[in-house]
Design a protein with these regions (language model features):
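Active-site-adjacent betaalpha module
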Residues: 1-11, 37-45, 60-187
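Short beta-strand segments at enzyme active-site cores
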Residues: 13-15, 48-54, 135
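Short acidic, Gly/Ser-rich segments with clustered Asp/Glu that frequently serve as metal-coordination loops
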Residues: 18-23
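Short glycine-enriched, charge-decorated loop/helix-capping segments at active-site entrances
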Residues: 25-30, 59-60, 149
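Short, well-ordered beta-to-alpha junction loops that form the rim of enzyme active sites
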Residues: 54-55, 112
Length: 187
């Protein structure tokens, strides 16, 4: 029930599933496998898959191995790839233009890192009028406990909890497990 007019379509938004972003991420292999499963499902159902790739000189320098999308995933040449430099995938990128061109008003979000780019992108989408479903077992983050953060499994669980109950007028949020994702409507 997006607030965006004439935007009836859904897209799978794959955020920052890059070597450097998931190298030490919680439950990395399972999460990447779940993302791959959803990419395959979206392609079979002719749902747009939109890739987002973070670039910064400190952690993910453009062109480096750390910057590359993980080898288990391969964007199709016809699938949009949006390069970003900030946590919110919409900030100073062409993502809004890409989604508008595809008639997308609902996003199914997967990727990394939960407590950074996933949260920022979810909120960025929601305030821009998108419906946003977070796939609860297809996002991950690294361990930042040495800086006072909760363990990664708790960060993920907390994000799933609060996104399940996120509300705003005219928009739908929520979570779904990989096996329960329905690209045809709210999960």
């Amino acid at each position: 029930m997006t607030t965006l007019e004439n935007r009836p379509n859904t897209a799978l938004l794959v955020v920052d599933v890059q070597n450097g972003a998931v190298a030490r991420a919680h439950d990395r292999d399972t999460v990447v496998a779940n993302v791959a499963s959803l990419v395959d499902k979206a392609r079979r159902e002719r749902i747009p898959v939109v890739w987002v790739q973070h670039s910064d000189e400190r952690q993910l320098p453009r062109g480096s191995d750390r910057w590359r999308i993980v080898p288990e995933l391969a964007p199709d040449d016809a699938e949009p790839l949006v390069e970003k430099h900030y946590g919110d995938s919409f900030e100073d990128t062409c993502l809004e233009t890409v989604l508008s061109g595809l008639g997308v008003g609902r996003l199914v979000v997967v990727g990394a890192e939960t407590d950074e780019c996933i949260r920022c992108t979810l909120h960025g989408a929601f305030v821009r009028g998108y419906d946003a479903t977070l796939v609860s077992d297809a996002h991950t983050t690294g361990d930042s406990t040495e800086w006072g953060a909760p363990p990664p499994d708790q960060v993920i669980a907390h994000t799933n909890l609060y996104w399940t109950y996120q509300t705003a007028p005219g928009r739908t949020a929520g979570t779904a497990r990989t096996k329960d994702v329905d690209f045809s409507g709210p999960s």
